[in-house]
Amino acid sequence: MASNRPQLSLKGRALKYLAAREHSRAELARKLAPHAGDPAEIEAVLDDLQARGFLSEARYVASVVHRRAERFGVARIRQELLSKGTPADQMTDALDALRTTELERARELWRRRFGQPPADAREAARQNRFLMSRGFSSDVVRQVLRLADHEHDHDNT
């Protein structure tokens, strides 16, 4: 049975996507592609949305960084942005700002997940893998585990 709802125009569909959350230009173009006959149509809609301020790469980057910063490191967030077609020059400032809090964010994530320094090499490797898989650099992971050990030693003296 066919739906009685009218088909959304490309612009209407794009606005529906943007109302749900921010999108990169490339991501929105990919989502609109199945509904357009001509790629030039999509570009025209995206240009119009960008000119009117509905579509903004800077806002998209800020949104992703805000949503992901608590749980992920710079490398993982950067990879997500690149996979969505965000130009590298659009994310540089946001990721540089995020690097300044990388150690604190990794320590907080480690505290919530583990809370205790690793008891043996196997547990240390597990904690290391967890933080690395979240996109934190090996230097930051090493510092987090070293600080955890140091704090634990201080608490026991």
UniProtKB/Swiss-Prot annotation:
Keywords: Cytoplasm. Its main location: cytoplasm. Signal peptide: none annotated. One of its GO terms (biological process) is regulation of DNA repair. InterPro entries: RecX_HTH_1st (IPR053926), RecX_HTH_2nd (IPR053924), RecX_HTH_3rd (IPR053925), Regulatory_RecX (IPR003783), WH-like_DNA-bd_sf (IPR036388). NCBIfam families: PRK00117.2-5. Belongs to the RecX family. HAMAP family: RecX (MF_01114). PANTHER family: REGULATORY PROTEIN RECX FAMILY PROTEIN (PTHR33602:SF1). This is Regulatory protein RecX. It comes from Leptothrix cholodnii (strain ATCC 51168 / LMG 8142 / SP-6). The gene is recX.
